[in-house]
Amino acid sequence: DFFRYLNYKIEWKDSLIGIKGPKGCGKTTMLLQHIKETFLGNDLDKVLYISLDNLYFASHDILDVVEAHYNNGGTHIFIDEIHYYEKWQTLLKNISDDFPGLNIVYTGSSMLQIQAGEGDLSRRQAMYEMRGLSFREFLQFEQGIKQDAVELEDLLHNHIGIAMNICSQTAILPLFKRYLKYGYYPFYKDVHNGIDIRLQAVVNQIIENDYAKIDDVNISTIRKTKKMLMVLSERVPQQPNMSSLYRELETDRNQGLKMLYALQRGGLLLLLGDNVKSSDNLSRPDKIYVNNPTLMYALSPYAEIGTVRETFFFNQLSEAHECRYPKA
């Protein structure tokens, strides 16, 4: 079976675990795999998996469900789509306080909402972030080729040997082209040729649902944010003329930067600047990218291959490194 990289990094014995990341990156699948591998058999009655996007919780109190599970010997609870619960942070505190010994794992599809409230839980929880498939994971997912993660230092000094080792196992270039086109999101195997439509639905949900909830933005801002994403997707990577962009969107600098960084936190854009902490101050980025090549192709089917490769490199490197834009 194929397991995501994050599955092996999580300390599953911790009492409170949060997993955040963009919609479609595979968080739910990872939870269900862990439950199957860990509890299948005599211990299955000790674990409860619930998803808060289920309509059941529109008229039922989740704390009643947790209490019933706990009183019947439950030791673990997995809460998916936590951001659908309006006061999710209070909910997690109450569960943690009221049910001692209960192990809690929760996920949120929107990085926006998880980030907005994680400060008060920071002392209690272990927080992890999941991203889309790396090319290394894609090779294993697609053809069963297992390759250890390559450190940047090793890549810089031994790239020829690393490349020869991988190329000896398969014809790598056709696979790389397929990865760039549709391989970043694990659900590509389920949708076949409909990945563009699926990704457009993901984008709409992030902007219309997640962004609207966290910042309580109105319909006009949602429309402008969608337009911003589409305008930028046709021009990236670029050193943006933000004043011109704001005029085109009929917005001001303050709102424009809020929309821009919301798109970044939602996993739709990558922003590159000379200061890695610039997002705290909402400063103008030096360069803007669509988050990953697969999303780039979905938003702009005729993306230039050099731009696609540059986006791939930035996306992969930023997983474990701070990327900065060099100043002259």
Model-derived features with residue positions:
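Accessory nucleic acid-recognition modules appended to NTPase machines
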Residues: 189-328
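Short glycine-rich substrate-engagement loop in P-loop NTPases that contacts/grips substrate
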Residues: 44-73
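Walker A (P-loop) phosphate-binding loop of P-loop NTPases
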Residues: 23-24
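Structural recognition of the conserved hydrophobic beta-strand(s) that form the central parallel beta-sheet
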Residues: 78, 103-109, 129
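Pre-Walker A adenine-sensing motif
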Residues: 1-12
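Interdomain motor-coupling "hinge/lid" segment immediately C-terminal to the ATP-binding subdomain
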Residues: 117-229, 233
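Hydrophobic anchor at the beta1->P-loop junction of P-loop NTPases
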Residues: 19
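Conserved lysine of the Walker
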Residues: 27-28
